[in-house]
Amino acid sequence: MPQMAPISWLLLFIIFSITFILFCSINYYSYMPNSPKSNELKNINLNSMNWKW
């Protein structure tokens, strides 16, 4: 029964909210996609104009 144990519920809510936000932000910003290099982009653009029909 929570009435018998006066726990600071607001403090617990703030702590859990901060940890949840930190966890989500770490997961979001930890993924770094590989960006293509400029030489690869030039090759892709040249090869894409070679139509086979």
Curated annotation (Swiss-Prot):
Keyword RNA-binding applies: no
UniProt keyword annotations, A-Z: ATP synthesis, CF(0), Hydrogen ion transport, Ion transport, Membrane, Mitochondrion, Transmembrane, Transmembrane helix, Transport
Biological process annotations from GO: proton motive force-driven ATP synthesis
Effect seen on changing M32I: In strain: HW00, HW09, NC37, NC48, TT00 and TT01
Subcellular location as annotated: Mitochondrion membrane
Transmembrane segment boundaries: 4-24
CC terms in the record's Gene Ontology section: mitochondrial membrane; proton-transporting ATP synthase complex
Keyword Isomerase assigned: no
GO MF, any single term: proton transmembrane transporter activity
InterPro entries for the chain: ATP8_metazoa
Membrane topology reported for the UniProt record: Single-pass membrane protein
Pfam family, one: ATP-synt_8
Chief location category: mitochondrion
Subunit annotation: F-type ATPases have 2 components, CF(1) - the catalytic core - and CF(0) - the membrane proton channel.
Family the entry assigns: Belongs to the ATPase protein 8 family.
Main function: Mitochondrial membrane ATP synthase (F(1)F(0) ATP synthase or Complex V) produces ATP from ADP in the presence of a proton gradient across the membrane which is generated by electron transport complexes of the respiratory chain. F-type ATPases consist of two structural domains, F(1) - containing the extramembraneous catalytic core and F(0) - containing the membrane proton channel, linked together by a central stalk and a peripheral stalk. During catalysis, ATP synthesis in the catalytic domain of F(1) is coupled via a rotary mechanism of the central stalk subunits to proton translocation.
Name of the molecule in the record: ATP synthase protein 8
Species of the source: Drosophila simulans
